[in-house]
């Protein structure tokens, strides 16, 4: 009796192996999607949400924030940080805004300040929405790069910090900004206004990340 050989067997085996490989890749991707987010992914999610709010307000009000001088931006951030501190200390609220929304407001005001530092006062007060998004994304990307560099050097030490520390550090940065403005922007060894705003922005992101994780 002769032995029959299925000449299609090698081809079928290859197809089956390919199907298994594709299936395993899909399973791996699903596990990754369902797993914990990376810090970069968390950062991007926070920025996306804050940008969405910022652009919606731009659609409603235009770029009315263009009239703000840096001292005014600093005051707005101070007000929000001080409000978070009051909430943390248990002072009775008469306004419904919570800590999360106040951190988001601080983030967006920090970006406003950074944009204002780049735009000359003699430019048009009203900016096109597309330009606003471009400027916002530019500052957010710079802030993220700063976060990545500091995480590389120090590890993610901020994950072990208290929410109160983020607020206190932001308040101290605001006081520094005001002093720099008083000194006409001149510093001897200290960082400038922009560096302080970037730090404030990242403190707000860190606060929002930890709130999202249920740790604050």
Q: What are these language model-derived features?
A:
Residues 5-6, 15-22:
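Acidic, Ala/Val/Gly-enriched low-complexity intrinsically disordered segments
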Residues 11-13:
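Short, often N-terminal, low-complexity regions
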